[in-house]
Amino acid sequence: ANSILAVSMANLVAHSKLVQKYVYELIPNIYGEPFLPVPFMNILNGGAHADNSVDIQEFMIVPHGFEKFDDALRSGVEVYHTLKKRLKDNGLATNVGDEGGFAPNFTSSKEVLDEIMMSIAESGYKPGEQISLALDAASTEFFKDDKYIIEGDALSNTEMSDYLIDLSN
């Protein structure tokens, strides 16, 4: 976001000068009415941020189905603690990675996502309706010789896209 943010801001400032308005006056006209920020909460780490065998760097939950920010935040904390209990109950490590998410050894990213989805449901929330998932794959960390080396496979660009689509299902 570093360069695109600067370009976007420069564009907004230039437009504000052109129409002779302050930037804050333009934002609702361009982007619509302000709305509640949605937290992205990192709850499980892999990749360069953890000493485990998970290739994807960050697995996040996105509590979006709430009217108040504190309800969204609370739901995320509840899922985090449910995940911790589930990990402990399954004999998995509850140590945290560099970014604050748990860093147990799972055998696949799908296994991680399944565990998070079960934690959401066990916490009493509706996966996909109230809380969704997000990934920061940090794929540059496992891109070698024009291939994505993930879970022991060497994937082309198209295969990597297909892999991520499969994960999302």
Describe these PLM feature segments.
Residues 20-40:
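Glycine/threonine-rich beta-strand-loop-alpha-helix active-site module
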Residues 6, 42, 60, 132-134, ...:
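Structured core elements
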Residues 11, 76-83, 87, 116, ...:
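Hydrophobic alpha-helical packing residues
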Residues 110-169:
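Acidic, glycine-rich loop-and-beta core segments that form the ion-binding/anion-interacting portion
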Residues 1-21, 73, 101:
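Metal- or metallocofactor-binding catalytic centers and their adjacent structured scaffolds
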Residues 58-69, 93-109, 138-151:
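Active-site-proximal beta-alpha loop/turn segments in soluble metabolic enzymes
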